[in-house]
Amino acid sequence: MTEDEQRPEGQEPGPASLPRRRVLVGLGLGAASFGLLRRLPTGRRPDRTGAAAPPTATTTTSTTAAPRPTVDVPPALDDSLAIADDGHVHDVVLAGGRVVDPGSHFDAVAHVGIDGDTITRISLEPLTGTTTVDARGLVVAPGFIDVLSYPVNGHGEWFKVADGVTTNLCLHGIDDTMADFLREASRLDPPVNYGGATDQYEHRKKMGVNLDWATEAQIQELAARATADVAAGALGIHEQPEYTLGLAFEELLAHGEVAARYDVPLCLHLRHSRPDPPSLQAEGVDEAIRVAWETGCRIHIEHLNSTGGTGRMADAVAQVDAARAEGLSITACVYPYTFWATYAGSARFDDFQDKYGIGHGDLQVANTPDRVTAAEWPSIRERNLLTAAFAMSEEDVTGALAAPWVMIGSDAILTESGNNHPRSTGCFSRLLGVYVRERGVLTLEDALARMTILPARLLEGVSSAMARRGRIQAGAVADVTVFDPDTIIDRSSIADTGVASAGVEHVLVGGRFVRRNGINDRSERPGLPILRDAE
C-alpha cells in the first residue's frame, strides 16, 4: 500500500453486520497482560502441539549476545552435495576469509568451494578453483535476506546488492496479484532473488473497498483472494491496520485463518504507533497476539521500533516474550534507524505533534537538506512529499535487538527518483558498521544471524528454497556476501538517500558474481523467484 491514503470520509465506526468488530481496539485493554488475553472468551484455541519453544534469553539492559562456543568443524547442510576430493577444481574458491555461519556457529578462517549454484566444500585447508578470490581480512557470510522490502523495480535492487542483499522479500506486501508480481519481476530480470506476501490492501483497492469497512461478504472475498495468492506462491499475508482505517478485527481473523491453513506468516504493520498514551501501542501488540491465539497462525510484526515499541520497547518485547512462552509463534523485524518516513498526506501525520511528541523541526523531506518549518508544512502535506519523522530513540532500536526473535528488514527499496528513506540503501551495512563495529551492541555472529538464518528459518517450512539459503554450509545455495568488517558502513542520509553502502566487496547469487571487487556487474542477472512450495 502506498502510504498516502486518507481516512474514509463520513464513516460510522463499522457496519452493524460485524457484531465483533474491532475487538481489541474497543476493549480498552491498555497495557493488559497476555494472561488477561488468555482469559477472554475466544471460542477457538489453536493446537499448539509442537509449537516453537519459548526463547531461553530474557530482555536485559545489555544487547550484546552471550558468547557462544566457537565451532571450527566445517558445516554441511547436505553431505550428498559436498565434494571431498582433494584434487577437485571448484568453479569458484573464496580463499582465506573469516567464514561465519550463524546457523552452525562456525566461525574460522577457511576456504569456501563453489560449483554451479552450490557451496560444495568448506575447508580449513586451501582449495583449488578456476576462479579464486583472495578473501583474507574479509568476512565470508551467507547472503543477506531482506524480509521487509518492496518489489524489485530495475533500480533499487542494485543498491541492495551493494548493501549485501541477495534475497529481496516483500513481506510488506506485493502491489498486485502474485501472478502479475512474478511476471513483472521476471521481466525485470533482477540480480537478487525475489518473493513476497500478498497484500490485503491491494485487493481492497481492486474490489473498491479501499479504506472503508468491509462487509462480511467482502471479508470472505478478500480472504479468498489471499488464498489464491498463497496458492500461487506468496510467502505470507500482509495487513496494515494503522493505514487501512476501516480494517476490522474480523478481517484480521479471516486472514489469520488463511495464514494458519497454509502455515505462512501473517505480517502486520500494527494498528497504533503513537507513544502517548502508551496503552495504544500495547493494544496494537495485544491485537496481533489475539489473532495468533484465536487462529493459530504465525505472526510477524513489521518494524517494531516504529510501530508497537516506540518509547516502550522493553514492554513490547515482554508482551511478545509472554506470548511465545505460551507457545505462540511471533517474530518481528526492525531497521537500525531512529527515524521513520512516509508520505506527508498519510493519516500517520494527522496531529503528529500530539501523537509523537515532536514538532515541525523534527521533520525532514527526503532529499532536502533542512528540517521542516511550520510555514512549509501545509504545502508539504498538500504535495504529499515523502517526509522523515525523527520520533524514535536509540533504545527503541537496541531494545529490540536484545530479543533473539527480532530480525532485520529495511521496509524500503530505492526508486529511480531517489525518493526514499536511507534504509533503502544502507540498512544492513549500517547494522554491521554502527551496531557491531562502532557501538558493540551486537556480536558479528548475532548481527549476521538476524539477516541470514533467522529469516531463512522463518520461511523454510513453506519454501524449500529458503531451507538452502541463509547458510554457509556444504550443500547450501551459493548466495554469499563478502565484506570488509573494518570499512562496511551505510552512506545514505535523509538529505541524500541514493548513496550506495561501502565495504561490501563481493556478492554471489546462485554462485554467480553480481558484485566483485566493490563493483556491481549489471550483466549478471541470476535472481530466482522464492515461492511457497506447491502442494
Question: What does each model-identified segment do?
Answer:
Residues F390-A391, T398-W405, S410-I413, V477-P526:
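C-terminal cap of metal-dependent C-N hydrolases
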Residues A82-A84, V100-H111, V397, R439-L448, ...:
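Acidic, glycine-enriched loop/beta-strand segments at the rims
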Residues R38-A95:
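C-terminal segment of N-terminal export signals and the immediately downstream linker at the start
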Residues K206, N210-W213, L222-L245, R290, ...:
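Active-site neighborhoods of metal-dependent hydrolases
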Residues V71-V93, R98-A141:
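Histidine-rich, glycine-flanked metal-binding segment
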Residues M1-P19, G43-R48:
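N-terminal secretory signal peptides
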Residues S80, A135-V140, I145, S149, ...:
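Divalent-metal coordination cores built from histidine and acidic residues
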Residues P19-V25:
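N-terminal export leaders
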